[in-house]
Amino acid sequence: MDVKRVKQILSSSSRIDVTYEGVPVWIESCDEQKGSAQVYDVSNPGESVHVDVTALEEK
């Protein structure tokens, strides 16, 4: 995935399934300059991690 698509997903009112290393995640924010996103595991929303947007996959 790229930064442009991450920003589209963030601004969308639709539910778009995204995974990180095969785990379903919600995207919380995107850092365009760093090319990273803050995501959290759908099953464990209390923990978020920063990941490279290229590691995210749209399902």
Swiss-Prot record:
NCBIfam families: PRK01625.1 (NF002451), SASP_H (TIGR02861). Keywords: Sporulation. It is found in: Spore core. The keyword Ligase does not apply. GO terms for cellular component: endospore-forming forespore. It comes from the Bacteria. It comes from Bacillus cereus (strain ATCC 14579 / DSM 31 / CCUG 7414 / JCM 2152 / NBRC 15305 / NCIMB 9373 / NCTC 2599 / NRRL B-3711). One of its GO terms (biological process) is sporulation resulting in formation of a cellular spore. Induction: Expressed only in the forespore compartment of sporulating cells. This is Small, acid-soluble spore protein H 1. InterPro entries: SASP_SspH (IPR012610). Belongs to the SspH family.
